[in-house]
């Protein structure tokens, strides 16, 4: 898949999450900042102003394999750069799975602590990347993420 196709694919999850946040009633407005260089460097796709005045930062990942494998990959390095989970300054990561339309949410800092504390095996992955591969069921069972109804 080309870079442009990857961007288009990732956009699908961003649109779904933005629509979900906007319709939730919890936010006054949601800003798509995925094309802004400043926020790209921080791996933040959406800013949501909560009705209480708090600003929540979201990173959105769209996955095309998890519906077949039942796993989520957390890249810690990709092509010599720091991977998304290690890099993101988002409060939450929304993980959209194409193929079954499921959406999961986890607190980025809490997930980093969980991965470090459990010393999971680090795998070599495609695109010169390495990271953790964990079962969605395990993450749900361990209360590290939750499923969001779309």
PLM regions and their residue ranges:
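Residue-level recognition of single "structural anchor" positions
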Residues: 21, 83-85, 112
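Non-catalytic C-terminal interaction segments of nucleic acid-processing enzymes
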Residues: 3-5, 19, 49-52, 70, ...
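Conserved catalytic cores of phosphodiester-cleaving nucleases, focusing on short active-site segments
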Residues: 21, 46-48, 52-66
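A broad structural signal for short, well-ordered beta-strand segments within beta-sheet-rich domains
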Residues: 23-27, 54, 142
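A short acidic/basic microdomain associated with nuclease active sites
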Residues: 4, 18-49
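Catalytic cores of nucleic-acid endonucleases
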Residues: 4-7, 28-33, 61-103, 108
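Extreme N-terminal tail/first-helix region
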Residues: 1-13, 17
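Short connector loops at helix/strand junctions that flank enzyme active sites
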Residues: 41-43, 53-57, 69, 87-90
């Amino acid at each position: 898949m080309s870079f442009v196709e990857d961007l288009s694919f990732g956009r699908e999850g961003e649109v779904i999450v933005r629509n979900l946040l906007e319709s939730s009633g919890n936010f006054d407005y949601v800003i798509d900042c995925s094309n802004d260089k400043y926020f790209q460097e921080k791996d933040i796709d959406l800013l949501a102003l909560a009705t209480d005045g708090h600003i929540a930062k979201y990173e959105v990942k769209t996955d095309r394999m998890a519906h077949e494998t039942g796993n989520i990959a957390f890249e810690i390095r990709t092509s010599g750069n720091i991977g998304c989970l290690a890099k993101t300054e988002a409060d939450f990561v929304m993980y959209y799975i194409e193929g079954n339309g499921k959406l999961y949410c986890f607190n980025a800092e809490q997930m980093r602590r969980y991965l470090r504390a459990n010393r999971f095996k680090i795998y070599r992955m495609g695109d010169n990347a390495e990271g953790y591969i964990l079962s969605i069921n395990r993450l749900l069972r361990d209360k590290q993420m939750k499923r969001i109804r779309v």
